[in-house]
Amino acid sequence: MKWVTGLLVVLLLGLQYKLWIGEGSVAEVWQLRQTLEAQRAENEELRYRNAALDAEVTDLKTGLDAIEERARRELGMIRRDETFFQVVGRPGETP
């Protein structure tokens, strides 16, 4: 009878070790879930960014308005019939 009880105790301790410390333990599963949630959030942000970039590429391929806007904003270009005015503030003055 003692050896049966001892065997059951050893078996219980072995299972508890596996549950709390071993591979696939509660702590490891919790950490993997946290990592998975962080990755899902990052993927969602990247999906939004990719959708915006895809829309911009489509707009650049199909219309001249997007190209003109980008040339004005990033390259400072103007049309031939336009006059460019640059307003400069006084030194030390913040806009």
UniProtKB/Swiss-Prot annotation:
- GO CC annotations on file: cell division site; cell septum; plasma membrane
> Could you tell me the Gene Ontology terms of the biological process aspect for this record?
FtsZ-dependent cytokinesis
So which stretches are on the Cytoplasmic side? 1-3
**Topologically, how does it sit relative to the membrane?**
Single-pass type II membrane protein
Please indicate which superkingdom the organism of origin belongs to: Bacteria
- Which residue stretches, if any, does this entry annotate as coiled coil? 26-73
Q: Which UniProt keywords apply?
A: Cell cycle, Cell division, Cell inner membrane, Cell membrane, Coiled coil, Membrane, Transmembrane, Transmembrane helix
Role this protein plays:
Essential cell division protein. May link together the upstream cell division proteins, which are predominantly cytoplasmic, with the downstream cell division proteins, which are predominantly periplasmic.
User: What protein family does this chain belong to?
Assistant: Belongs to the FtsB family.
| Protein name in UniProt | Cell division protein FtsB
**From which organism does this entry originate?**
Thioalkalivibrio sulfidiphilus (strain HL-EbGR7)
Taxon lineage: Bacteria, Pseudomonadati, Pseudomonadota, Gammaproteobacteria, Chromatiales
